[in-house]
């Protein structure tokens, strides 16, 4: 959807650029700046704005956390789009078996479906994060709607787990000038990620595992998915099958696992 909007905005800006050029020339304003230069100017602005919206680590809209300290052999596992049963419970089983703590960025709508799972996440020492209510494309929304979806998700998550989330991750990592500021106003620190392995493409458990292991580095925040937006019970078995091997290989390479908050704070992983 967002790519259609990008195309529409770009075509609109080209039309506006041509109109501005004609008006400017008609009134004798900046006569040397012809239609082509107006178009180029608007397109350059489009590129800058789109880069800021779609590049999760771009500082254009402010700084955002996307990795922990590089001087410590610690990493964080994060899971987006849950809870999604029975798969989130299977993720929790694997983490419990390996004695690893992780961070779950939850969708409010999914949290309403499976409140008991959120309680288990908290009881087993994992961290809760806010991933909005409905996984909408936030750059297409205004400040009021952004605040509403973040606050509503935090309310649902707190009711289910007894803990209000203190971290926020925008769906797809896409932001606009208001997203990070509003998230902080709502008590959530925005967090992106260091390593995404496109596990939602279902490339196979071996590929998912190898991509994670190959991309590991100190302070790495790993993005995986225990759900798929608001899809009803999407099958994420490939990711779950890869998870024990990911944890084992990371430990063999000397990495320890921490929740995102502990990783960013530089405190000892549990």
PLM region spans:
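Short, solvent-exposed loop/turn segments at secondary-structure boundaries
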Residues: 140-144, 202-204, 233-237
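A cross-domain feature marking catalytic cores of carbohydrate-active enzymes
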Residues: 79-81, 106-108, 130-132, 170-172, ...
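A short, flexible beta-alpha/helix-coil linker loop
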Residues: 134-136, 197, 228-231
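Catalytic grooves of carbohydrate-active enzymes
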Residues: 213-264
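N-terminal pre-catalytic segment of deacetylase/amide-hydrolase enzymes
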Residues: 1-77, 84-97, 114, 119, ...
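Divalent metal-coordination and catalytic microenvironments
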Residues: 80, 95, 104, 128, ...
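His/Asp/Glu-enriched short active-site or ligand-binding loop at hydrolase and phosphoryl-transfer sites
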Residues: 174, 180-216, 255-266
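Active-site beta->alpha N-cap acidic-glycine motif
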Residues: 51-141, 145-152, 156, 161, ...
């Amino acid at each position: 959807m967002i790519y259609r909007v990008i195309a529409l905005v770009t075509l609109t800006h080209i039309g506006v650029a041509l109109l501005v050029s004609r008006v400017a020339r008609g009134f004798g304003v900046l006569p040397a700046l012809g239609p082509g230069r107006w178009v180029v100017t608007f397109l350059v602005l489009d590129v800058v704005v789109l880069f800021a919206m779609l590049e999760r680590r771009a500082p254009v809209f402010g700084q955002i956390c996307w990795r922990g300290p590089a001087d410590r052999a610690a990493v964080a596992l994060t899971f987006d789009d849950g809870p999604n049963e029975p798969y989130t419970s299977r993720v929790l089983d694997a983490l419990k078996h390996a004695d690893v703590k992780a961070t779950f960025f939850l969708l409010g709508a999914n949290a309403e479906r499976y409140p008991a799972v959120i309680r288990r996440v908290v009881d087993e020492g994992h961290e809760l994060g806010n991933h909005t209510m409905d996984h909408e494309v936030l750059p297409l929304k205004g400040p009021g709607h952004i605040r509403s979806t973040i606050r509503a998700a935090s309310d649902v998550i707190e009711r289910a787990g007894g803990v209000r989330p203190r971290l926020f991750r925008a769906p797809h990592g896409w932001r606009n000038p208001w997203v990070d500021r509003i998230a902080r106003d709502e008590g959530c620190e925005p967090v992106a990620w260091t390593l995404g392995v496109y596990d939602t493409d279902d490339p196979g458990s071996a590929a998912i595992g190898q991509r994670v292991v190959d991309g590991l580095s100190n302070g790495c925040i790993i993005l995986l998915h225990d759900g798929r937006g608001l899809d009803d019970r999407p099958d994420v078995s490939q990711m779950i099958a890869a998870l024990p091997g990911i944890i084992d290989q990371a430990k063999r390479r000397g990495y320890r696992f921490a929740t995102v908050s502990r990783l960013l704070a530089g405190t000892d992983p549990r």
